[in-house]
Design a protein with these regions (language model features):
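Acidic, low-complexity, intrinsically disordered interaction modules
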Residues: 16-71
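Short terminal alpha-helical segments
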Residues: 1-25
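Alpha-helix initiation/capping motif
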Residues: 4, 27-31, 81
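Short acidic DE-rich linear segments
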Residues: 75-81
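Short, aromatic- and cysteine-enriched interfacial helices/patches
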Residues: 2-3, 41, 74
């Protein structure tokens, strides 16, 4: 996924939790915050844009968090920050 600058900035408060998910393969982000992150990326109707519509399985959630973190890293590296 490719993030806009606005999305990247909105996701910064979650960066440590996303990094932890990637390095430890463990998800510590509360579900409410995870849903907020999905809304930042996909918009208000995020549940119609991803499958499954609500990733409740730990592995699916972890996989998405790692993908989001990787996208944040790519944005940071491409913007020179």
């Amino acid at each position: 996924m490719i993030l806009t600058e606005e999305q990247y900035k909105a996701l910064l408060p979650f960066e440590a939790e996303f990094r932890y998910a990637k390095t430890s393969q463990c998800c510590i982000l509360p579900h409410v915050k995870f849903l907020k992150a999905l809304e930042i990326i996909y918009g208000k109707n995020w549940n119609t844009k991803i499958s499954p519509s609500i990733p409740t399985c730990g592995y699916c959630k972890l996989k998405m968090m790692v993908e989001i973190y990787d996208s944040m890293e790519r944005f940071k590296n491409n913007s020179g920050n």
